[in-house]
């Protein structure tokens, strides 16, 4: 809805690559966030697809270009150097369209697990 998220929230995420495509499973744990709102409003399903634009200036320009053509940013965030935007394309695509810079970020070791084993 474009409004700032108030308060703390937590979610779990599992990610893997199959070929050149990354798949994420996101489970909200507590607090209000885009993923918990999605589940409340729509139930389980595909939340977003993502386009990676590695350069931040190019990313900002692409988001501005897409937004000028109709789909507005309904959520954006930053985690360390990772910047991402969700465009409201649900009615047209059946999912939100994420654009982000795919910056490499680190997580605390206790938050990282590998299955079946670390590569």
Q: Over which residues does each language-model region extend?
A:
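Histidine- and/or cysteine-centered catalytic micro-motif in compact active-site loops
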Residues: 28-30, 54
């Amino acid at each position: 809805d474009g409004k700032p998220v108030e308060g703390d929230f937590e979610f779990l995420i599992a990610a893997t690559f199959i070929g050149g495509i990354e798949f994420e499973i996101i489970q909200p744990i507590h607090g209000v966030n885009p993923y918990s709102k999605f589940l409340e409003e729509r139930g389980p399903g595909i939340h977003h697809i993502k386009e990676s634009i590695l350069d931040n200036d190019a990313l900002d320009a692409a988001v501005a270009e897409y937004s000028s053509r109709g789909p507005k940013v309904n959520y954006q965030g930053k985690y360390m150097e990772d910047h991402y935007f969700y465009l409201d394309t649900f009615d047209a695509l059946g999912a939100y369209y994420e654009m982000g810079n795919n910056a490499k970020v680190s997580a605390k070791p206790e938050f990282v697990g590998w299955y079946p084993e670390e590569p």
